């Protein structure tokens, strides 16, 4: 989002940390290798390109890019592409597109700040040799299963590897042979030599490098050993002059290893202070949604949804296709805020953000989603009277839209009943209602087919009651229904999306998340729309009066033949 559209930032513990660093000049007066000044606040967003970003990533993007923006710093986009088996350029492209869609940029006066961890493979390898030479890293020849079994748990310490005391020369020779491709996958790993009795299991001689004979999306087959995330991440931060490495709470236990690697490399003289520091904030737990990549992939592969960009998915491509705006995502993040404690955020907050955003900007229109014909019997067959309504009731400068009132109309099936319940003010025989922006009418009856289904409703116009005329209030009515001209309406496909899950925490505990799928999360209807919608372009958003907010589908919608997705209803239908 542009800074012009950003609201005043709310104070939180991350801002307090940054404010203190600025006051102390922790990262002041730095210059890069070319002599260019480095801002005192440099953050980064480092996704692994092994899937599509989801709403949880949006919060991390907002935090990292937003902090950099608010402090006139910069934020880097860095791909943590150290696992060639799971990564693909498809995901790289989708992540770049998603961050751009959210309105953020990684460019500044110093150029583009788009990076890949694979850019640093040679340097990372060199740093690994430095740790070996300092006697704090060793090649372990145990199997992955043995390493896991010997790591211990929270009740017992780990067991030292029988290969832990190899000499520096032997470790260097083995590590270089690993790089040269002389060993099979899993035959050796490089581990840090820290403390196998550490209370924090992360610090029990973590693996730094593993052998993986796999094609990398950028480096091809140049490498057959790849660094682990914990080794790569902190060094990449240091090489890019990151100041504040902001990540979610699941990495809290990894922070000591982050510091351990950087401290050893600083002491070896290959990295210089001031070094970056990692800080953790609460990740986003959204009700009625899942964000596990494995489970999202299962939904896609089992065809429980229509792909990664299914509008019911929590992926950013799905949320975008649903009709959410970048501004609504930012508003949602602002309302959720930044804290140190994990908590569940109700889906209604996300829906409320897009509802508030679109209420302020979306043009109004009319759509009949479950149509039944209404015949006005006391006007001629060629009756055609122009009606108009504001494009937006709070923005008169946008003008008015015009549409015809004719003898035959489409109305919502639920707006007529033969036997009205108490409090029903819409059409039933003998009752009067107003046709929105048109006349007051009185219902006279209905037609049915042989099965008893209502095929048409009949009514008479009450003259001199048209909206906007002196006689508009001459007949008092309680009901007001919307309509479109049967002769002029635009027929279109409308997809009524709802929450994908009916359980607020579908994968908590030992639940099978598939059991919580909402069978009513998608309904496709043939609707009749106000004819002005024929010119709707992909991603144009509207309020369909009395129904909610809708968007022209960015993939399937065509000029003159739009397809609309429901973004959100006018009110929260899930509230207790």
Curated annotation (Swiss-Prot):
InterPro entries recorded: aa-tRNA-synth_I_CS (IPR001412), Gln-tRNA-synth (IPR004514), Gln/Glu-tRNA_Ligase (IPR050132), Gln_tRNA_ligase_bac (IPR022861), Glu/Gln-tRNA-synth (IPR000924), Glu/Gln-tRNA-synth_Ib_cat-dom (IPR020058), Glu/Gln-tRNA-synth_Ib_codon-bd (IPR020059), Rbsml_bL25/Gln-tRNA_synth_N (IPR020056)
Known EC number: 6.1.1.18
Keyword Methyltransferase appears in the UniProt entry: no
Catalytic activity: tRNA(Gln) + L-glutamine + ATP = L-glutaminyl-tRNA(Gln) + AMP + diphosphate
BP GO terms, sorted: glutaminyl-tRNA aminoacylation; glutamyl-tRNA aminoacylation
PROSITE patterns (alphabetical): AA_TRNA_LIGASE_I (PS00178)
Disulfide cysteine pairs (residue numbers): none
Amino-acid positions noted as binding ATP in the UniProt annotation, renumbered to this chain: 48-50, 54-60, 248, 283-284
Subcellular location(s) per record: Cytoplasm
UniProt keyword annotation of Aminoacyl-tRNA synthetase present: yes
Coiled coil (residue ranges): none
Motif 'HIGH' region: chain residues: 47-57
GO annotation, cellular component aspect: cytosol
Keywords recorded for this protein, A-Z: Aminoacyl-tRNA synthetase, ATP-binding, Cytoplasm, Ligase, Nucleotide-binding, Protein biosynthesis
GO molecular-function terms, A-Z: ATP binding; glutamine-tRNA ligase activity
Oligomeric and partner information: Monomer.
Family: Belongs to the class-I aminoacyl-tRNA synthetase family.
Name listed for the protein in its UniProt record: Glutamine--tRNA ligase
Organism: Ralstonia pickettii (strain 12J)
């Amino acid at each position: 989002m542009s800074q012009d559209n950003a609201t005043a930032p709310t104070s939180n513990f991350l801002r307090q940390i940054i404010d203190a660093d600025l006051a102390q000049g922790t990262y002041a007066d730095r210059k890069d290798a070319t002599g260019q000044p480095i801002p005192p606040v440099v953050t980064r967003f480092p996704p692994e390109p092994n899937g599509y970003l989801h709403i949880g990533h949006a919060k991390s993007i907002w935090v990292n890019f937003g902090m950099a923006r608010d402090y006139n710093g910069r934020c880097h986009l860095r791909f943590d592409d150290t696992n060639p088996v799971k990564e693909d350029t498809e995901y790289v492209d989708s992540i770049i597109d998603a961050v751009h869609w959210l309105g953020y940029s990684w460019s500044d006066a110093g150029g583009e700040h788009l990076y890949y961890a694979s850019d640093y493979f040679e340097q990372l390898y060199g740093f690994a040799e430095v740790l070996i030479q300092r006697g704090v890293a060793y090649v372990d020849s145990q199997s992955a299963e043995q390493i896991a079994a010997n790591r211990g748990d929270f009740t017992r310490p780990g067991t030292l590897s029988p290969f832990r005391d190899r000499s520096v020369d032997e470790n260097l020779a083995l590590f270089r042979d690993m790089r040269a491709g002389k060993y099979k996958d899993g035959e050796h790993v490089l581990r840090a030599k820290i403390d196998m009795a550490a209370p924090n299991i992360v610090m029990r001689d973590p693996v730094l490098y593993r052998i993986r004979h796999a094609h990398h999306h950028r480096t091809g087959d140049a490498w057959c050993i790849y660094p682990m995330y914990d080794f790569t991440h902190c060094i990449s931060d240091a090489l890019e002059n990151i100041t504040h490495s902001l990540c979610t709470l699941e990495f809290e236990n990894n922070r000591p290893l982050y510091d351990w690697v950087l401290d050893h490399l600083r002491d070896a003289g290959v990295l210089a202070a001031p070094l970056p520091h990692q800080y953790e904030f609460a990740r986003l737990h959204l009700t009625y949604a899942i964000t596990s990549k494995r489970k999202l992939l299962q939904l896609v592969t089992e065809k429980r949804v229509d792909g990664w960009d299914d509008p019911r998915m929590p992926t950013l491509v799905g949320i975008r296709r649903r009709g959410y705006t970048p501004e609504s995502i930012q508003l949602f993040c602002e309302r959720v805020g930044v804290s140190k404690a994990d908590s569940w955020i109700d889906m209604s907050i996300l829906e409320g953000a897009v509802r508030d955003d679109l209420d302020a900007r979306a043009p109004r229109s009319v759509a009949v989603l479950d149509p039944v014909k209404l015949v006005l019997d006391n006007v001629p067959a060629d009756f055609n009277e122009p009606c108009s309504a504001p494009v937006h009731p709070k923005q008169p400068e946008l003008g008015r839209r015009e549409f015809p009132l004719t003898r035959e109309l489409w109305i919502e099936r639920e707006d007529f009943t033969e036997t009205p319940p108490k409090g029903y003010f819409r059409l039933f025989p003998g009752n009067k209602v107003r046709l929105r922006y048109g006349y007051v009418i009185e219902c006279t009856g209905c037609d049915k087919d042989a099965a008893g289904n209502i095929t048409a409703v009949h009514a008479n116009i009450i003259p001199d009651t048209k909206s906007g005329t002196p006689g508009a209030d001459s007949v008092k009515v309680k009901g007001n229904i919307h309509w479109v001209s049967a002769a002029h309406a635009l027929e279109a496909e409308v997809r009524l999306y709802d929450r994908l899950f009916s359980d607020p925490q579908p994968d908590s505990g030992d639940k099978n998340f598939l059991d919580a799928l909402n069978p009513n999360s998608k309904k496709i209807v043939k609707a009749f729309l106000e004819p002005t919608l024929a010119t709707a372009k992909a991603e144009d958003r509207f309020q369909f009066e009395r129904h909610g907010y809708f968007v022209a589908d960015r993939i399937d919608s065509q000029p003159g033949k739009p397809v609309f997705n429901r973004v959100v209803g006018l009110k929260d239908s899930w509230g207790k």
